[in-house]
Amino acid sequence: MNTLLIGGRGLFLNGSRLSVIGSPTPPSLPPYTIRLKFTEGVTPTFSKGTSVQVSSSPNIWDLTYENTKWGQLLSRQTGLIEVIVANTSGVVYMNYMFSGCSSLTTISLFDTSSVENMLGMFDSCSSLTTIPLFDTSSVTNISTMFNGCTGLTTVPLFNTSSVTNISVMFRNCTSLTTVPLFNTSSVTNMSTMFYGCTGLTTIPLFNTSSVTNMSNMFYGCTNVQSGALALYQQASTQATPPTSHRRAFRDCGSNTTTGAAELAQIPDDWK
């Protein structure tokens, strides 16, 4: 067992993972600082902030960026494999923060209570299988947040009460089988939300009362068994139906007996 002392706390190396000795509390970091683990031998190049290597084996780096806008801060860091800990109190923008980090597998829970924009935050993070329950109470835009996360299997029930744009959120998340019943009462745009989610088996009855755009929402979700018909019936008969809904259910459920039966009852202009 190797021991690494950082900021007065003892850390031990358990295989390839850095853990805290004697306390579940992560090591304290300066404001606007994130601790990252990269593939052995990789020397990351950062376009923003100040970086320092904490350890060479495992390959740990601290990045400090004293700014509330962290958009694209770590995008396309293909050698990044873990977010160990972060002091992100006060950060407002995290749009495309980890986009294109195709080797990222592990993310710790960090402070997102002030974040308003998570657009494309994990876009194309194809190695992610799970995600922490981030505080999304202030977020209004989560469009393309998990677009192309082909390894993602589960999603927590985020607080989406302030979200207005949820479009393309899970496009081509082919390993996703179910999703929680998010609060979508403020959402206006659901277009392409689950496009190409071939693993999806059920569709929750989302609140569509404010939605104006549902186009391509479940396009290509061929293994859906239930839920499509109920959602169509709700959306099409609400006080103000969506004005855009072309291909909302194109091929949705076409590979399953019950799904195909529901699809047959949905009008052509919705599929």
Give, region by region, the residue ranges found by the protein language model:
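Glycine-biased low-complexity/repetitive sequence motifs
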Residues: M1-P31, R35
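Negatively charged
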Residues: G22-K271
